[in-house]
């Protein structure tokens, strides 16, 4: 049986994944985070699906320019009343603060989950050493 690093889970079949996730809380956190609707992975998959669903263009259609989805359209009043730099700075600071808060929260959860996983690994190692000692004594 090949040895694995203490911080890495043993390789298991897919059908055993729920058991593995329950034994490794840090993996459970990562799994739930990456499977959440706001997951960056899901966004990439959605974008890939969207790009794959585009119909192929015929030669006639290639000459028609596609409308750029990223174009920002401003009304005349928005152009006349530009946002002050101070307001932009405040908005940017608020956005960065919320992003950093979310990252810190996720990091704290991950650290806690990782710590629990390490404790569980230590408990399992103790049990293994006790069992191997009992086997030698028998």
From Swiss-Prot:
This is Putative uncharacterized protein C15D4.08c. It comes from Schizosaccharomyces pombe (strain 972 / ATCC 24843) (Fission yeast). Residues 1-23, 35-83 are annotated as: Disordered. Residues 60-69 have a biased composition (Acidic residues).
